[in-house]
Amino acid sequence: MTKKTQDLTSWYDQLLVKAKLICHGEVKGTVCFLNNSWGLWMEIQQLYNDAIANKNQLSAIALTKFQPTTSFCYQVFQVQLPTLSFYSEYQKEKTHIKGFNPELFLINQVGQKQLNDPLVLRPTSEIAFCNLWKKQELSYHDLPLIYNQWTQVFRAEKNTRPFLRNSEFYWQETHGLFVDQSQSEQAAISFWNLYQDLIINKLCIPAFVGLKSESEKFAGAKNTWTIEAIMPDGQSLQCATSHDLGDTFTKSFTISYQSKTNQKMTPSSFSCGMSTRILGAIFLTHSDDYGLVLPWYLASKQVKLYLFDKNNNPKTRALAFLVKDFLEKLKIRFSFIEINNQLGKQLLKGEIEGIPLQMIVDNEKTINIFNRLTRLKTSLTFANLQTEFVNLVNNYHTEMYRKANDLVEQKLARVQTLKEIEQAFKNKKAVLCTVKLTGELEQHLKTKYQVSVRCVFKKSDVTQNCPFTNQPCFDSVLIARAY
């Protein structure tokens, strides 16, 4: 493989093939998910579904990087909505919601019949959920009403890269109705916190979290909360977003609920989503020149256990089955392979696939353990494995985050003068600075430097002069190129 530090684009393309993650589809921007990548997406689904069901508490072997500021206390129903809708619905929303103009795939003909109102392949589902809610007779007893679906969406993208920007991709989207905007805003923040826990704690991705600027937030949203990760090329990757939509969509679709006083009231809504783009973030952040490196909580197989016994020693076999039983009791996701040749080939395959820990039992006394993250081997007796396994996993988890954070720091500049900022842009780094944030400044950044404001943090308590306008400023922001 091309070295990651020499040519990130070539390395990434080769990684996807070597690790058997995808095959390219026939249509530009589409891919065939192979079992190695789809298995990871299924684990993402499990992590999120457990989280919204309040089953996904961090175990004792996790080191918490982020503590949610609000408790999660919502009931979420799993649903599946149609892929097709009418083009006229999107045209209607363009007149109601400034900026709501997703790039659409249109179907103009069904069989031999030309359609007067073309069909649209789902680009997002705000409209679909609004049409669903409009058909339901709702009262204040029914609210909040929150739905989640796992599905695919379609965007007519010009420049595509697998996982990072696709014409067809998979995601989860959660949509909810509430009696007023204070509740929809609180829900948006709660789900944003949930994403942070998953992305930072479970996936070990260092992230910058905050609000989207006015020009970058979701069209129609009162506010959009984002989670941004800096990739090895200095670009920012949007990992997940959560939107307080207020009554923007519900008023447009004349959705109502019956209040306690039997009045028809307009509810507020929110939506949030995370897509298969998160897999691209994982691959870029953690993987190396030898193949995938996967977070412990994500790996479809956390351990591969090999019984390598050429001499048919019953004591060696007994040790292997002791380890197998031990892993089963801990509910570790693992595979057990009995082989008597080509062990090196199997270990190499496991390395490319990013198996966190590979264990080899080839004698009656010790277990050899290969750590994918450090690429180091250790030997433990079964007694030591029992006492040290939690530390093995915890160290893997925390070291993965540390390494990822060190790489982010190399691609990040905390600067304030215009000269420093321009030098950082020249060096293809992301920038943390304080500015006077205006629409004019955002357009200037895009036009002159081809960068954008990715994230807005809490306002600074210290008055500084904006490096671009020389006016007093309080807005702490992350500025970067974006995927």
Swiss-Prot record:
It catalyses: tRNA(Pro) + L-proline + ATP = L-prolyl-tRNA(Pro) + AMP + diphosphate. Keywords: Aminoacyl-tRNA synthetase, ATP-binding, Cytoplasm, Ligase, Nucleotide-binding, Protein biosynthesis. GO terms for biological process: prolyl-tRNA aminoacylation. GO terms for molecular function: ATP binding; proline-tRNA ligase activity. It holds the Pfam family tRNA-synt_2b. Disulfide bonds: none annotated. PANTHER family: BIFUNCTIONAL GLUTAMATE_PROLINE--TRNA LIGASE, PROLYL-TRNA SYNTHETASE. Belongs to the class-II aminoacyl-tRNA synthetase family. ProS type 3 subfamily. Consists of three domains: the N-terminal catalytic domain, the anticodon-binding domain and the C-terminal extension. Catalyzes the attachment of proline to tRNA(Pro) in a two-step reaction: proline is first activated by ATP to form Pro-AMP and then transferred to the acceptor end of tRNA(Pro). NCBIfam families: proS_fam_I (TIGR00408). HAMAP family: Pro_tRNA_synth_type3. This is Proline--tRNA ligase. It comes from Mycoplasma genitalium (strain ATCC 33530 / DSM 19775 / NCTC 10195 / G37) (Mycoplasmoides genitalium).
